[in-house]
Amino acid sequence: MKVDDGLEEPAGSETWAAKPAELVGAAASDVDIDPVIHAQARLRIMATLAAVPVGDELHFPRLRELLDMTAGNLSTHLSKLEGAGYVQQNKTYAGRSPATYLALTPEGRVAFERYVRNLRSLLDA
């Protein structure tokens, strides 16, 4: 039998589709998933910046290229992350041209690690 998500129902399980919600239901109320990070674009930004070694920064155009996002969309999500204290933007000049470099703040790194840990515990429930 096929369910809406395209997965096969295991043999002998007539209530398979309801089981994930039952298993996760109790655990989900105990797990805090940060809504600032959880949005897809911001999660991709955080994951990319988390891969940058502490003390290093990523140039805005490189992040935009890696994530295949428009400059406006990336800027909007970076502003939200910066407002939460998760990302810092270092605006400077390279010659006469403005340049923006990005990095996770220490709080942002901790928040991302907590997010990953909480998501894993939710998925493992």
Predicted regions, residues:
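Canonical helix-turn-helix DNA-binding module
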Residues: F60-T92, R96-S97
